[in-house]
A protein has these predicted regions:
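An amphipathic alpha-helix signature
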Residues: 1, 73, 77, 81, ...
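Helix-turn-helix
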Residues: 3, 7-41, 45-49
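Short amphipathic alpha-helical elements of helix-turn-helix/winged-helix folds
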Residues: 3-7, 86, 149
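Hydrophobic/aromatic residues within well-ordered alpha-helical segments
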Residues: 39, 46, 50, 54, ...
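Hydrophobic alpha-helical connector segments
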Residues: 45, 58-93, 142-146
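Amphipathic alpha-helical packing segments from all-alpha helical-bundle domains
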Residues: 55, 74, 89, 95, ...
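Amphipathic alpha-helical segments used for helix-helix packing
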Residues: 75-78, 86-108, 155-160
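Hydrophobic/aromatic-rich alpha-helical bundle segments in the mid-to-C-terminal region
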Residues: 129-178
Length: 187
C-alpha cells in the first residue's frame, strides 16, 4: 500500500498503473490484483488508511480537549488549535487532501467514512447540549457552525497563503475569534 500511495500522489489516480505499483512494491502485478482486485479498490484502501489516521487524530483531540468540566471557551479553543496545528500540517492530512482532491474519475470514499470526523464532533456537541453547556437544538448544525467559524476558516487561510504556518498568530486568531462567535450564538 505504501507503493500505491506514493504513486497515486505522484502520478494521480488515472496515470498510476498497476504495473508501476507492482514494480515499486517489488511484487508481481498478479499479487496486487490478488490482494486488492482492481486499481479502484487499491486506491480506496489507500484513502481509507489515511482517513483512519485522521480519524484517530480528531478522536484524540475531541477526547482530550473537549472534556467534561473544562471551561467551554478554553476547551473549544484548545480543540480548534490542536486540529489546526497538529492535524492540518500532518502528512496524513496533506496526503488525504491530495488523494481526495483528484479528478472525478478517482473512486470516492463512502460518505459515512469520509464524514466520520464531523460525526464525532456532532456527537460531542450533542453531549454538550444535553449537559446544558450550549443551546443547540440541532447539534449537527452547531458542529457545522463551529467547524465553519474555526477550522474551515483556518484551513482556507492556510490554503490561500502557502507562507502562513499553522502556528502563526493569524491562524490562531481565526480559531479564537471563531470560538467567540460560536459561543455568542450557542450559549
Amino acid at each position: 500500500m505504501d507503493a500505491a500511495e506514493a504513486l497515486f500522489l505522484a502520478e494521480g489516480y488515472e496515470r498510476a498503473s498497476v504495473d508501476a505499483i507492482a514494480a515499486r512494491a517489488q511484487v508481481s502485478k498478479r499479487t496486487v490484483y490478488d490482494h486488492f482486485g482492481e486499481k479502484a479498490a487499491l486506491f480506496l484502501r489507500v484513502v481509507e488508511r489515511v482517513n483512519d489516521a485522521l480519524v484517530r487524530s480528531v478522536r484524540a483531540a475531541i477526547e482530550e480537549e473537549l472534556t467534561p468540566g473544562r471551561d467551554l471557551r478554553d476547551a473549544l479553543t484548545a480543540f480548534g488549535r490542536r486540529v489546526v496545528t497538529q492535524t492540518f500540517p500532518s502528512s496524513d492530512y496533506i496526503t488525504f487532501r491530495r488523494l481526495t482532491a483528484q479528478q472525478w474519475s478517482a473512486p470516492r470514499l463512502a460518505e459515512a467514512v469520509r464524514d466520520q470526523p464531523e460525526r464525532m464532533l456532532e456527537e460531542r456537541f450533542a453531549v454538550l447540549a444535553a449537559d446544558g453547556e450550549i443551546r443547540a437544538p440541532d447539534p449537527v448544525l452547531a458542529a457545522r457552525h463551529f467547524t465553519a467559524l474555526t477550522i474551515s476558516l483556518a484551513l482556507d487561510a492556510l490554503d490561500d497563503r502557502r507562507d502562513v504556518e499553522a502556528e502563526e498568530p493569524e491562524t490562531l486568531t481565526i480559531i479564537t475569534d471563531g470560538v467567540d462567535a460560536f459561543l455568542r450564538a450557542y450559549r
